Regions:
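N-terminal nucleophile
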Residues: 1-216
Length: 216
């Protein structure tokens, strides 16, 4: 995933935009993982994990974004897709050795706290997101990101986040909904949008498939 917007308060809201190669297979949200009962998310059919996991009974969600930095060794590398599943299920961020993972940002959110673990391939950085509306991108909590500068003020001012994703895809670096046709013919684009709302008595998960077909 490439973009996550979080709004704290009595109603915790998360919106994620998943950018990926259009030919990478996936399926929509469900309880796909017997090892994590009660956890819902879309599943990456290549690696088996997820980019956003929700545990409704625990009033908790976790989101995974690709990061920048030093890649893991190919001989020992493992998928990052299990990180959001484990975090949503256990309510804990990973401890210990992270060197088997490529760089990432992992957000763990509930009604009391929103935590961020950023791993650049060399050292982990742990922080809490501030109260209000924040935006996490592939460079983390980055106020200098073109996407953050373009869209964070709009999300802060808007009561209808869905309206902000109903725009034409663009190859612009600052666009929220993207579409890049690469020289080799492959398509890298925003494939789906997830909006999760967590309240003391209710959790909702809205999933929007942005693709007309899985081949782009």
């Amino acid at each position: 995933m490439c973009t996550l917007i979080v709004k704290t308060g009595p109603r915790l809201t998360l919106m994620g935009v998943r950018d990926e190669f259009a030919d990478r297979p996936w399926e929509g949200p469900g309880e796909h993982w017997p090892d994590y009962p009660g956890v819902i998310g879309g599943r990456d059919l290549k690696a088996g994990g997820t980019w956003l996991a929700v545990h409704p009974a625990a009033r908790r969600a976790a989101a995974l974004l690709n990061g920048h930095g030093r890649a893991a060794e190919e001989t020992t590398k493992v998928s990052r897709g299990d990180l959001a599943l484990k975090a949503a299920y256990t309510g804990e961020l990973p401890e210990g050795d992270l060197t088997r993972y490529d760089p990432f940002h992992l957000v763990l959110a509930d009604l009391t706290r929103v935590r961020l673990l950023s791993w650049d391939g060399e050292r982990p950085v742990r922080s809490d997101l501030p109260a209000g509306t924040s935006m996490v991108v592939n460079s983390g909590l980055d106020d200098e990101s073109e996407r953050v500068r373009a869209y964070l003020p709009r999300f802060r001012d808007s009561d209808d986040w869905r309206a902000l994703i109903e725009e034409e895809p663009s190859a612009d670096r600052g666009a929220l909904i993207i579409r890049h046709e690469l020289p080799d013919g492959r398509l890298f684009a925003s494939l789906s949008v997830m909006e999760v709302a967590i309240e003391p008595g209710e959790v909702t998960y809205e999933f929007t498939d942005l693709t007309a077909d899985r081949d782009g």
